[in-house]
Amino acid sequence: MTDSEPTSAATRSAPVSVLLPTVRWTDACDEVADQLRGPEAFGGADNAGAGEGAGDDAGSGDDGDGADPAADELLVICDSPDDPVAERRGDLPERVRLRVAGEPEGCSGKANAIAAGMEAAANDRVAWTDDDFHHPPDWLAALDADYEPRGPTTEVPVFVGLDPLARFFEPAYAIGGTLAVSVGGIAWGGAVIFERDDLRDGEAAFRRDLRRTVSDDGTLTEHLDVTAADRTRDVRAGGSFRGSLERFVRFLTITRYHAPLATAFNVLLGVSMAALCLLAPVAGVALVTALAGAVYARFGIDRATFLLAAPGALLAPPLMAYALARRTFVWGGRRYRWRSLFDVSVEPV
């Protein structure tokens, strides 16, 4: 599928700090860096302090002083000075800075990176993104333009499987992920924009919560009222059987702690759909396949994997039972033991 048509934005009303956690320099870094605008786009004059590589982190985790608050910026956030992306220090594109977040303690590496990025960001308007999808040339302009009429705005993810198990999960992710983000007031950390004052309990409380939990976008949803743009992004998912299984466990655990009632509903729905497919196979398979097909059509997902919805429904109860029984999961090279919303320990893999 292709991304939905973005909103055109000839001018930008406020400079944006884009936070991109990654341990490697990827195409996404270049894509976003190419979209940054200097002070001249906001009525100011360019200055030498915001030149190429200005303000990049020196490896201590502290900010450089070259950030220009009257311009867009990209903060590339890694865990350690030893991460491959840190080799770009001193050779960064214009208005790009490197931030070293440090090893996470009592939270996920992603949440820790976002908290560090929020501290380091020079602007009040902040966008989060990830490195696992393509950012077209007007990605940032469209997201920024959406903020003016909507306030905090998120785009909508479509998870595209890279291995057989990930492709098997696609119908479930379309219904429980794509559709849920679109209509449920859920922030997707891959493409969301907001201002610091939009955080209901203030930024300090938000950063404190990030540093004691796992899910960055789940935590943002707890602190922010957000609406979804009618625009999707294809997100690469999986690549190995084990990685896709760990992702499924992580996703279900996130909803378990951030939306327990929704999780209970999903479990009951999964059991009901499986029972229907077993007891009335013709009607059950037709209903489940039609539901998945309707969601695919709504979001322009041009993939045949909606036909896997019925087999997925049959396997949903044992898969959910497995995920709920798991006490740990692996994400980004770390094992997390997530006991409750704000009780997380990080263990070696």
Regions found by a protein language model. Give the residues of each.
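Short alpha-helix within the catalytic core of nucleotide-sugar-dependent glycosyltransferases
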Residues: 33, 123, 136-145
